[in-house]
C-alpha cells in the first residue's frame, strides 16, 4: 500500500546523541512523512512517556520507536525488554538504530522483539535508508493490520 498516512505517526526517538537526533529529523523531513516526534535521551524517560501515551483517551496513532542500544543509565536492550512486557508495548514498532554492526546484537534484539535493526551508516545518503524503512513499516507492518483504516 503506497498511500499517504491519514493519521500522523507517533515517532519516539530514544537517543542521547544530538547529532543522530538531527539526522533522524532530517531523514523524516526529507521523506515527507506525517509524524509527531518525541525525542527522549534515556530509557526511564522513554518508559514514562509510553505510560503517558497509554493513559491518553484518544485514537491511537501507529507508533514507531527508534531505539539506540547505548544509552545512559540503562541500555536500549533493557528498555526493549520492558516495552515488550507491557500490553501497550505490543502496539509499538521498535526499530533498533545503532552503530553496532555486530551480528550477535542484531540476533539478540530481534529475538527480544525488535521489529527491525538499522546500523547507523558513515555516509549521509545511506542514512536516508532509515526513512525508507520507516515508510515500509508504516504502510506494511503486520503490527497494525487491524488498524489499516487509519494508515
Task: Locate each region found by the language model.
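Non-catalytic signal-transmission and effector/linker regions of two-component phosphorelay proteins
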Residues: 1-12, 17-36, 44, 51, ...
Amino acid at each position: 500500500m503506497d498511500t499517504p498516512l491519514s493519521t500522523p505517526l507517533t515517532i519516539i526517538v530514544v537517543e542521547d546523541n544530538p547529532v543522530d537526533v538531527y539526522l533522524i529529523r532530517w531523514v523524516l523531513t526529507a521523506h515527507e512523512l506525517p509524524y509527531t516526534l518525541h525525542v527522549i535521551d534515556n530509557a526511564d524517560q522513554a518508559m514514562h512517556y509510553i505510560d503517558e501515551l497509554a493513559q491518553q483517551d484518544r485514537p491511537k496513532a501507529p507508533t514507531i520507536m527508534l531505539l539506540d542500544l547505548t544509552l545512559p543509565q540503562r541500555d536500549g536492550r533493557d528498555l526493549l525488554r520492558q516495552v515488550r512486557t507491557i500490553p501497550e508495548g505490543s502496539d509499538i514498532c521498535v526499530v533498533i538504530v545503532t552503530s553496532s554492526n555486530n551480528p550477535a546484537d542484531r540476533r539478540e534484539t530481534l529475538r527480544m522483539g525488535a521489529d527491525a535493526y538499522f546500523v547507523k551508516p558513515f555516509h549521509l545518503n545511506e542514512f536516508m535508508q532509515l526513512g525508507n524503512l520507516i515508510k515500509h513499516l508504516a504502510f506494511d507492518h503486520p503490527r497494525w493490520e487491524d488498524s489499516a483504516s487509519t494508515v
